[in-house]
From Swiss-Prot:
Main location: nucleus
Superkingdom per UniProt: Eukaryota
Composition bias type Gly residues, residue spans: 14-32
Gene: TIFY3B
Post-translational modification: (Microbial infection) Acetylated by Pseudomonas syringae HopZ1a. Ubiquitinated. Targeted for degradation by the SCF(COI1) E3 ubiquitin ligase-proteasome pathway during jasmonate signaling.
Subcellular localization, as worded in the UniProt entry: Nucleus
Locus of motif Nuclear localization signal: 141-148
Species of provenance: Arabidopsis thaliana (Mouse-ear cress)
Pfam families: Jas_motif, tify
Disordered: annotated segments: 1-50, 152-187
Recorded GO CC terms: nucleus
Chain intervals with Basic and acidic residues compositional bias: 1-10
Record protein name field: Protein TIFY 3B
Length: 187
């Protein structure tokens, strides 16, 4: 966070006062006079001024907008942060809740003797999440897409080299009982 510090300024009566580069004061036109030079004002304010706490500035990013608050006491800022943290905890605890099946969401029947509390007694009732058909079938769709891709890639490789190349040399031909016709059948 950037703090903006106001520079002390000398008051000017009836004209325009301009500070030159070395910190002195100069008067442009008019009949007024500069009450104090800027150097005098700075030195007296530094000696007499107590270290004051600059006003707190709070910047909030919410809903796509930026809001800046100046001069908030630190107690209010801490309270706002506590409220925001509590809201985030509540939001996270409800969003992490497990998805339950419809059978678990049924209210207990009147003939039931179990001591399980009804869903209405829960502080945050579990809402069943409805999935779109495309969202629910997404892993299967990915699998089918991958399978189609691999088939097309295999077809491209086969079309590029339709016949397997043999790296056999004449010395690699077996000399045993196996004939060449059995090892490399034609047709």
């Amino acid at each position: 966070m950037t703090k903006v510090k106001d520079e002390p300024r000398a008051s000017v009566e009836g004209g325009c006062g301009v500070a030159d580069g070395d910190g002195g004061a100069a008067e442009i036109g008019g009949t007024g006079s500069v009450e104090k030079s800027i150097n005098e004002v700075r030195s007296t304010e530094i000696q007499t001024a107590e270290p004051t706490v600059p006003p707190n500035q709070l910047t909030i990013f919410f809903g796509g907008s930026v809001t800046v608050f100046d001069g908030l006491p630190s107690e209010k800022v801490q309270e706002i942060l506590r409220i925001a943290a509590k809201a985030m905890e509540t939001k996270n605890s409800t969003s992490i809740s497990p998805v339950s099946s419809p059978a678990l969401n049924r209210a207990p029947s009147f003939s039931s003797t179990s001591n399980v509390a009804s869903p209405a007694a829960q502080p945050f009732p579990i809402q069943p999440i409805s999935f779109c058909r495309s969202t629910a079938d997404l892993p299967i769709a990915r699998r089918h897409s991958l399978q189609r891709f691999l088939e097309k890639r295999r077809d491209r490789l086969v079309n590029k080299n339709p016949y397997p190349t043999s790296d056999f040399k004449k010395t690699d031909v077996p000399t045993g009982n196996v004939s060449i016709k059995e090892e490399f059948p034609t047709a």
